[in-house]
């Protein structure tokens, strides 16, 4: 199944990676690689992750501190990348 990043989710990810890289470049690179690897798994098994708090979404824990919020339709739409302590929706 095709994975498509929504512009807002891509912007959130870049903001997170910029913040982390200012403090620890290696950690930012590891998180980036973890997210990239997770989206490959997501494409193969989109329903393996838990149901999301928002109706029609699912949540993938990529790292203990970060979640990817996505929706499965005719493709996988990545809607948001959040810190685990962040409140939503």
Report residues per predicted region.
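Basic, Lys/Arg-enriched alpha-helical interface segments
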Residues: 2-57
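Conserved strand-loop elements at the edges of beta-sheets that form or border functional pockets
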Residues: 62
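Absolute protein N-terminus
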Residues: 1-2, 89
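Enriched for short, Lys/Arg-rich terminal
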Residues: 66-67, 71-89
């Amino acid at each position: 199944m095709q994975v498509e990043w929504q512009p807002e989710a891509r912007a959130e990810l870049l903001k997170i990676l910029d913040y982390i890289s200012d403090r620890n470049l290696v950690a930012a690179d590891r998180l980036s690689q973890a997210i990239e690897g997770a989206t490959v798994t997501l494409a193969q098994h989109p329903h393996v992750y838990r149901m999301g708090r928002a109706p029609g979404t699912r949540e993938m824990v990529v790292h203990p501190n970060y979640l990817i919020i996505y929706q499965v339709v005719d493709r996988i739409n990545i809607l948001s990348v959040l810190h685990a302590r962040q409140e939503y929706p």
